[in-house]
Amino acid sequence: MGYYDLDDILADSSKFACRFNYELPGLGYLEGNPGKPVGKHSKVELPLWLASVLATVTGEQEHVDEEALPFVEFLPPEMFSARVVNAIKADAPTLDVHSINGHFYALGTRWAALFSDAGLAGMLAGMVLERALEVQRHAASAAVEATAPTDATARMLQTLDEWERQLYRRAHAASRDAKLWAARR
């Protein structure tokens, strides 16, 4: 992952629901009201790159004894809801991660880092291990000359997020190269 990585750019542009803690003039266009202020407690979907900055920068204190609040507060995203977490814990290898979000792992690691969520990080690590075994199994079972994946592999590929698809491509290429090398011996 890097600065010019398209998957990073697309993941950072994923929108998350946020609530504003202050009324901010001139930002009404975020709600579809250009030229007007965005109201306090307004709920708006913002791209992750913008929301993460606004969630870490604090505004002015209204009273001396109060703690300054960040400009926005993240609302719990659907992709990390109890329903999704329970589905991951129940059977991670068969979960259709792509239908949840095409950049699930990238967003999950950013979310875990942003909120220091060790539980989410641990769940994602376990999920990666379980699903990587399945990805490797499908990648290694493909024939050397195969131009199209089998039906089972094609169905599995549709459930992968972008990181897992890159993993499949690399594992398939490594398996193909190993089979070609073994055939030459």
From Swiss-Prot:
One of its GO terms (cellular component) is nuclear replication fork. It is found in: Nucleus. InterPro entries: GINS_A (IPR021151), GINS_bundle-like_dom_sf (IPR036224), GINS_Psf3 (IPR010492), GINS_Psf3_sf (IPR038437), PSF3_N (IPR055221). Keywords: DNA replication, Nucleus. GO terms for biological process: double-strand break repair via break-induced replication; mitotic DNA replication initiation. The keyword Nuclease does not apply. Belongs to the GINS3/PSF3 family. The GINS complex plays an essential role in the initiation of DNA replication. Component of the GINS complex which is a heterotetramer of SLD5, PSF1, PSF2 and PSF3. This is DNA replication complex GINS protein PSF3. It comes from Eremothecium gossypii (strain ATCC 10895 / CBS 109.51 / FGSC 9923 / NRRL Y-1056) (Yeast).
